[in-house]
UniProtKB/Swiss-Prot annotation:
It comes from Xanthobacter autotrophicus (strain ATCC BAA-1158 / Py2). One of its GO terms (biological process) is glutaminyl-tRNAGln biosynthesis via transamidation. Keywords: ATP-binding, Ligase, Nucleotide-binding, Protein biosynthesis. Heterotrimer of A, B and C subunits. This is Aspartyl/glutamyl-tRNA(Asn/Gln) amidotransferase subunit B. SUPFAM superfamilies: GatB/YqeY motif (SSF89095), Glutamine synthetase/guanido kinase (SSF55931). The gene is gatB.
Amino acid sequence: MTLHVRPTDTKKLISGATGDWEVVIGLEVHAQVASNAKLFSGASTAFGGPPNDHVSLVDAAMPGMLPVINQECVAQAVRTGLGLKAQIHLTSVFDRKNYFYPDLPQGYQISQYKQPVVGEGEVIVDLPDGESIPVGIERLHLEQDAGKSIHDLSPTQSFVDLNRSGVALMEIVSRPDLRSAEEAKAYVTKLRTILRYLGTCDGDMEKGNLRADVNVSVRRPGEPFGTRCEIKNVNSIRFIGQAIETEARRQIEILEDGGSISQETRLFDPTRGETRSMRSKEEAHDYRYFPDPDLLPLVLKPEWVEELKSGLPELPDEKKARFIADYGLSPYDAGVLVAERETAAYFEQVADGGGVKRDGKAAANFVINELFGRLNKEGKDVTSSPVTPHQIGAILDLIAEGTISSKIAKDLFEIIFTEGGDPRVVVEARGLKQVTDLGAIEKVVDEIIAKNPDKVAQVLAKPTMLGWFVGQAMKASGGKANPQALNDILKAKLGI
């Protein structure tokens, strides 16, 4: 494997008491495969059922029950690998990972160790400051999820729910290419976006569909990697950032005090803002991996992989590039719009819907600033928007025609958002049309000039005062005066 060697970024260094430190981060993201049935049984993967309601004899590890691979889960893993620009291994092997845990009924987990279904790939991560960084994908393998232990139903007993047991997971392992909490959060956000575009994982972290094991180490700039600690099962992007910052500080304090870091598995406690030791970090030999004798090697036909590849949707990076090229959007605006598949589709229906080709920049500005801003206030997303793309398109058409001004458009949008209706009908019914009658605008301007001779003297000495006259005229016209006509008349009347 060729390692991506990333130069030290001084902006990402952490200041310690004895100098600067660089944090090195790698992530193992566990993504639940979007499928109706589990990896090796026909039991349902539906979330939220009564305990032990979706459990087959295979999931419960009853004697004599043999696993049978779910082809759709394999297809979803291959689609994900293709979406990550990764190598697809036509032959892969399922292994038994041996360890004991109460919610693991087999006494081992079926996973993939030496021969995963997907090899090396890459994710391009866009950071808030406009920088883009490549993050290497080391591998993607399929494995079973475990069940769930429940400890809060009784003070003296623990219970096991096997509904989740046997559900297919994709473990997506990144290289240690990340250098800050912000980069790690951006990486998981981008990875989740790709999975959602592909339809291979819902990415709902609240339901446990996506969770991460976070590997953190620190070193002096330019030195070899330090000893890493793994923070298990972090279940939100915000907590991933907090866990990294907390663990990096803990390690720096130990090293600056002359201590050493023990390689171990830790848990993040968001309430206390600390990581706690869980157990010493296992090595691969501790799990006694060996090929599962109940499962033949998984052999994929090249033409089947090509068929899956031909059916892939347009992914975020390609869509972003197209939005920039076709609609003239800035990289930032295009990035905001493609962050979710639904928002990208909504924008395209506004900019290019109903057979009308609209100004892309104007459409993006209105969708991002007006629609998204209003939805955020209501705690909604675009899928539950009360305003349709057709309605926003109609508002933009009214602006382009000169029927309404940009200011009136905001008022009109608020009416449509709260009350609904056809924008054109609302404009007519409420008298919101822009005043384009030059005579009417001139009359308003004459009245303001006549009433404010002192301001006239000031604007002749200080032309920037023109804005005051514009404001007064707009107020007098109820915000309906055509802004360009108003400016032209004012300048002519005032002689500036």
